[in-house]
């Protein structure tokens, strides 16, 4: 279930402040954040945001298609290695 339209999209204030500061200065350095729950706003376009996945910060370059999605959608937290293969040696 999505967020109520009357509330509007959510983004952490500290992340918005970092992006606004970078936009004013005109620099494109990597912005490190732990806020996976923040919605991507149009002001984020063109910035690289390092989103924490529980182990490391994953760099996410924000494009126009990402607006409206959450930052956490682009930094997966689980790595799937695959199921065990057919080990015919052990079945003998």
From Swiss-Prot:
Protein name as catalogued: Small ribosomal subunit protein uS19
A Pfam family reported for this protein in Swiss-Prot or TrEMBL: Ribosomal_S19
Gene Ontology, cellular component aspect: cytoplasm; small ribosomal subunit
MF (Gene Ontology): rRNA binding; structural constituent of ribosome
Gene: rpsS
Disulfide bonding pattern of the chain: none
Transmembrane segments: none
UniProt record similarity statement: Belongs to the universal ribosomal protein uS19 family.
GO BP annotations listed: ribosomal small subunit assembly; translation
Keyword terms, alphabetized: Ribonucleoprotein, Ribosomal protein, RNA-binding, rRNA-binding
UniProt function note: Protein S19 forms a complex with S13 that binds strongly to the 16S ribosomal RNA.
InterPro entries: Ribosomal_uS19, Ribosomal_uS19_bac-type, Ribosomal_uS19_CS, Ribosomal_uS19_SF
Record-linked PANTHER family: RIBOSOMAL PROTEIN S19P FAMILY MEMBER (PTHR11880), SMALL RIBOSOMAL SUBUNIT PROTEIN US19M (PTHR11880:SF8)
């Amino acid at each position: 279930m999505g967020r109520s339209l009357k509330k509007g999209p959510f983004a952490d204030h500290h992340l918005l402040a970092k992006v606004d500061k970078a936009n004013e200065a005109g620099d494109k350095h990597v912005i490190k954040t732990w806020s996976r729950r923040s919605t991507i706003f149009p002001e984020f376009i063109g910035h690289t945001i390092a989103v924490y996945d529980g182990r490391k910060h994953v760099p996410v370059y924000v494009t126009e298609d990402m607006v409206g999605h959450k930052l956490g959608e682009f930094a997966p937290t689980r790595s799937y290695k695959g199921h065990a293969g057919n080990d015919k040696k052990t079945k003998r």
